[in-house]
């Protein structure tokens, strides 16, 4: 679809430097190179106040857009709330029905003038998202970078969030994965897993602590959830304890002091050999009523797993080590590296090897 984009750029003093505003400028010019003639871009900047630096301009006039980006300089305080309001106002003015209407916020998240509290910014963006304009948040800088705030803003704005620390990462997000970053194909996407108790006696979702939903929210179309872009994939790992297997993590509850322990009655099961059922709900980008899909899975008891699965498992293990999870077991950085090295056969762009370097760096810092 045709894109109506608004670059909302933080040019406050905290964004000074080649790895902040300098990298923002280089990143956005990568995106500009891929604009079509029918696409349009406006540029809004904010520091002590907000202003329109470039009115909505055709993608055919790339040089004009690049020049406006190159002219940006950093200095002053950070009126992020004012900038967000102006960016949404301009995006709504140039709204393309059936198009990709999106604000791209580039910042370190250090809002300190006007609407700057987490709650105030969340409420502002929750109101603005009703217009059908999506929000992509690109984070820059180290030290005072507010990662949690950026993630929350993206979630409230029906959008996505990425951290850009070098030009290679900018190229990945804004060029190689342009469709997944910029084009929403499904909104309010929800997943619900039902395990068969005759096959699984206990389970644990690894990660996603900030994305959990109540069971009843799965069928509630008023409940906000995640958006997915073109070519976007999502991976969720569950750790399970098969039925009949002894585990230290099952039934670790003290006996009641004032009541007799009563063995719970066994729930009747259907006798199904299915391991689980995956339930998916989603809405089309321009619709408000969700669709539901269900897919059962039978465990074939095989140990052959794909390289993608092994790599994702290595990433999950790495995450548990970084946060020193109580459930990390005997996992080590060496095990993460060994597992990831068995899954490098599908790494044309070198992202998996970059992950290996991150793990090796983390291991070195720990020592």
For the regions a protein language model found, what residue spans apply to each?
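Exposed acidic/Ser/Thr-rich ligand/metal-binding surfaces
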Residues: 1-189, 216, 248-268, 346, ...
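Solvent-exposed coil/turn segments that connect beta secondary-structure elements
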Residues: 12, 46-49, 59, 196-198, ...
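Beta-strand signatures of extracellular beta-sandwich domains
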Residues: 42, 190-192, 279-281
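Short aromatic-acidic-glycine turn motif
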Residues: 51-54, 197-204, 287-289
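Generic beta-strand hydrophobic packing signal
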Residues: 138, 203-204, 208
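Extracytoplasmic assembly/pore-lining segments of large envelope/extracellular complexes
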Residues: 181, 185-188, 193-204
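Long, acidic serine/threonine- and proline-rich intrinsically disordered regions
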Residues: 200, 208-235, 240-367
């Amino acid at each position: 679809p045709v894109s109506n984009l608004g670059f909302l750029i933080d040019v406050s003093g905290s964004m000074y430097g080649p790895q902040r505003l300098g990298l923002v400028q280089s990143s956005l010019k990568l995106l500009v190179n891929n604009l079509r003639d029918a696409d349009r871009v406006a540029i809004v900047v904010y520091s002590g106040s907000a202003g329109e630096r470039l009115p909505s301009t055709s993608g055919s006039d790339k040089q004009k857009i690049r020049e406006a980006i190159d002219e940006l300089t950093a200095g002053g305080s950070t009126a992020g709330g004012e900038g967000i309001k102006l960016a949404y106002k301009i995006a709504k003015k140039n709204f393309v029905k059936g198009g990709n209407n999106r604000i791209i916020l580039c910042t370190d998240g250090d809002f300190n003038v006007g609407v700057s509290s987490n709650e105030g910014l969340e409420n502002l963006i929750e109101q603005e998202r009703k217009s059908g304009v999506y929000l992509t948040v690109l984070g820059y800088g180290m030290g005072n970078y507010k990662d949690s705030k950026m993630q929350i803003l993206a979630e409230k704005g029906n959008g996505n969030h990425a951290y850009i620390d070098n030009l290679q990462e900018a190229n990945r997000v804004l060029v190689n994965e342009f469709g997944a970053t910029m084009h929403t194909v499904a909104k309010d996407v929800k997943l619900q897993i039902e395990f068969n108790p005759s096959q699984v006696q206990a389970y644990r979702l690894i990660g996603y602590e900030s994305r959990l939903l109540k069971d009843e929210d799965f069928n509630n179309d008023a409940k906000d959830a995640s958006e997915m872009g073109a070519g976007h994939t999502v991976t969720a790992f569950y750790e399970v304890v098969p039925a009949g297997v002894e585990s230290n993590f099952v039934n670790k509850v003290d006996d009641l002091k004032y009541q007799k322990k009563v063995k719970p009655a066994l729930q009747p099961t259907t006798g199904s050999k299915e391991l689980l059922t995956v339930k998916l709900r989603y809405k089309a980008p321009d619709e408000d009523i969700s669709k539901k899909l269900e897919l059962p899975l039978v465990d074939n008891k095989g140990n052959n797993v794909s390289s993608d699965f092994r790599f994702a498992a290595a990433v999950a293990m790495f995450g548990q080590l970084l946060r020193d999870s109580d459930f990390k077991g005997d996992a080590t950085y060496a095990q993460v590296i060994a597992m990831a090295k068995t899954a490098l056969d599908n790494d044309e762009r070198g992202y998996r090897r970059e992950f290996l370097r991150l793990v090796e760096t983390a291991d070195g810092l720990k020592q």
